[in-house]
């Protein structure tokens, strides 16, 4: 796992708060991380 993914975790915890479409982004990021 990369530090970038860890740094973005806080934002992913609140997808409806500011990033409603983050669901698709996190899946792509995790796929790249793995």
Swiss-Prot record:
Positions of disulphide bridges: none
Superkingdom of the source species: Eukaryota
Coiled-coil parts of chain: none
PTM section of the record: Processed by the macrocyclase-peptidase enzyme POPB to yield a toxic cyclic decapeptide. POPB first removes 10 residues from the N-terminus. Conformational trapping of the remaining peptide forces the enzyme to release this intermediate rather than proceed to macrocyclization. The enzyme rebinds the remaining peptide in a different conformation and catalyzes macrocyclization of the N-terminal 10 residues.
UniProt keyword annotations, A-Z: Toxin
InterPro entries membership: Amanitin/phalloidin
Propeptide: 1-10, 21-34
Gene Ontology terms, MF aspect: toxin activity
Chain positions of cross-link Cyclopeptide (Phe-Pro): 11-20
Function (record text): Probable toxin that belongs to the MSDIN-like toxin family responsible for a large number of food poisoning cases and deaths.
Protein family according to the UniProt entry: Belongs to the MSDIN fungal toxin family.
The protein's name: MSDIN-like toxin proprotein 2
């Amino acid at each position: 796992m990369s530090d970038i993914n860890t740094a973005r975790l806080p934002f992913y915890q609140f997808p409806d708060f500011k990033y409603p479409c983050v669901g698709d982004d996190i899946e792509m990021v995790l796929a790249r991380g793995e």
